[in-house]
From Swiss-Prot:
One of its GO terms (molecular function) is molybdenum cofactor guanylyltransferase activity. It is found in: Cytoplasm. Mg(2+) binds at residue 106. It comes from Acidiphilium cryptum (strain JF-5). PANTHER family: MOLYBDENUM COFACTOR GUANYLYLTRANSFERASE (PTHR19136:SF81). The N-terminal domain determines nucleotide recognition and specific binding, while the C-terminal domain determines the specific binding to the target protein. GO terms for biological process: bis(molybdopterin guanine dinucleotide)molybdenum biosynthetic process. The lineage of its organism: Bacteria, Pseudomonadati, Pseudomonadota, Alphaproteobacteria, Acetobacterales. This is Molybdenum cofactor guanylyltransferase. The keyword GTP-binding applies. Disulfide bonds: none annotated. HAMAP family: MobA. Belongs to the MobA family. SUPFAM superfamilies: Nucleotide-diphospho-sugar transferases. It catalyses: Mo-molybdopterin + GTP + H(+) = Mo-molybdopterin guanine dinucleotide + diphosphate.
Length: 196
């Protein structure tokens, strides 16, 4: 169950993608409304959880100014975003966390009461006819099961592991989709202009 005080809840911001549709730009450092996408993500989750970390590939020094731990995928690098979720679960467990909130860095409009609205883990956000598999609450106790899943032959689909642990979808009926992703320059321009 999500702890309303956030003391047993941790968050991992997922920023491991290559940003290919944006020409290889680091999405975490893209500017939207005068702030980086990572600033937006930190602001979204920080009031909901006891601690925040970032899952990102490459040199962690580029994120030093944000003051949060930067997690690496380790031996599961290249197996997709679940490697970042696993790194987040391991970090959360080491810091006394029982539940992990995951949020992609390219989802700047997620609600600041996301964890409370998701309720008990495992839960995933759904809106406007889509399931947003990485906007989710994960039980940290599922880390060993996720490790076995990633040690398997694949495919390493988030939906596959979510089904394995019985993740339930929680509908967000907001008029505007709170889980719009910024994947292209057109998406960024639309977000900047308030069209999404």
């Amino acid at each position: 169950m999500a702890d309303p005080s956030g003391s047993h809840l941790r968050a991992v911001i997922l920023a491991g993608g290559a940003g290919r549709r944006l020409g290889g730009v680091d999405k975490a450092l893209l500017i939207l409304h005068g702030r980086t996408m990572l600033d937006h993500a930190i602001a979204t989750v920080s009031g909901q959880v006891g601690a925040v970390a970032l899952s990102a590939a490459g040199d962690p020094a580029r994120f030093a100014r944000f003051g949060i731990p930067v997690l690496e995928d380790g031996r599961h690098r290249g197996k997709g975003p679940l490697a970042g979720v696993l790194a987040g679960m391991r970090w959360a467990a080491a810091s006394g966390g029982e539940t992990l909130l995951s949020l992609p860095v390219d989802t700047p409009f997620a609600p600041r009461d996301l964890a409370a609205r998701l309720g008990a883990a495992p839960a995933v956000a759904a809106s406007h006819g889509r399931t947003h598999h990485l906007v989710a609450l994960w039980p940290v106790a599922a880390a060993d099961a996720l490790e076995r899943f990633l040690d398997g032959p694949g495919p390493y689909r988030v939906s596959g592991f979510a089904a394995e642990i019985g993740m339930r979808a929680v509908a967000f009926a907001d008029e505007r989709d709170p889980f719009v992703n910024i994947n292209t320059q057109a998406d960024l321009d639309a977000a900047e202009a308030g069209r999404c």
